A protein has these predicted regions:
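Conserved class I S-adenosyl-L-methionine
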Residues: 1-44, 59-63
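C-terminal alpha-helical "lid/dimerization" subdomain adjacent to the S-adenosyl-L-methionine
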Residues: 2-5, 22-24, 147-207
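A short SAM/SAH-binding and catalytic strip from SAM-dependent methyltransferases
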Residues: 116-128
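A short glycine-rich, Lys/Arg-flanked "PGG" loop and its adjoining helix->strand segment in the class I
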Residues: 130-142
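Core SAM-dependent methyltransferase catalytic element
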Residues: 190, 194-233
């Protein structure tokens, strides 16, 4: 069974070659550009803050900062080795990229703190995907947007790429169908769901949804009742 310890071990090994992986060209780069186009359409040159879940070595965080100099980018990753590899990249942005080690299923942030939450090509590694979406939903500000892109496994080519090739290398990871994404988003209370397929050598599905203006009480309490270490962004700055 694929679990957090297996994910940690896999990415610890991958951290040594992650920035030079062919996937940066074939998969990650196109995914990053798709989300940046959406950020541009939504914010233009206005300031915003974003949490990138599964940030790895910070390649995407740096691309966001390059395009949106007024943005504040927070990155969280399960694996310290990934963050260590990106240390110089993070430090080059004068505190406007803030990396934190943590778990997508227990985000160490207060409720409703981010304008945007992004997740690029890491969701299939999350053992409890429903809980991860609930956490993404919890930390979004009312009206904030979740942008989650991952492998598109619907159709013959998608199943071959993700259910056979990727699963053969990475083990028991799970790429969601478009319907499964819709079910997860709706169950978490997200609204205004839209989905767009991005074709290419490795097709991806960009899922977008919005946090409603009123946060249901169960979601407000989730961070504390689940035993999360909830940390407000201002508290982090005071400590550092």
């Amino acid at each position: 069974m694929y679990d957090t310890s297996l994910a940690k071990d896999e990415f610890r090994k991958w951290s040594r070659s992650y920035d030079k992986s062919i996937l940066q060209l074939l998969l990650f780069g196109p995914s990053h550009r798709a989300i940046i186009r959406r950020l541009q359409a939504r914010f233009g040159d206005s300031p915003f803050n974003v949490l990138d879940i599964g940030c790895g070595t910070g390649v995407f965080a740096e691309r966001i900062r390059a395009r949106f100099p007024n943005a504040e980018v927070w990155g969280i990753d399960l694996v310290a080795a990934m963050l260590d590899k990106g240390r110089e990249r993070f430090q080059a942005h004068d505190g406007r990229i803030i990396p934190i080690q943590g778990d997508s299923e227990r985000l160490p942030f207060a409720n409703a703190g981010f304008d945007v939450v992004t997740c690029c090509n890491s969701f299939h590694h999350y053992p409890d995907q429903g809980r991860a979406v609930d956490e993404m939903r919890r930390v979004l500000a009312p009206g904030g947007e979740l942008m989650l892109i991952d492998g598109y496994r619907d159709g013959l080519w998608g199943r071959l790429i993700y259910d056979v090739c990727v699963a053969g290398v990475e083990g028991e990871v799970h790429h969601c169908s478009a319907r499964r994404f819709r079910d997860l988003f709706h169950a978490s209370g997200l609204i205004e769901l839209s989905q767009k397929v991005h074709r290419g050598f490795a097709p991806c599905l960009l899922n977008r949804a919005t946090a409603p203006a009123i946060i249901p009480m169960p979601h407000i309490a989730a961070g504390v009742e689940s035993g999360h270490r909830v940390m407000a962004k201002s508290e982090h700055r005071q400590r550092n």
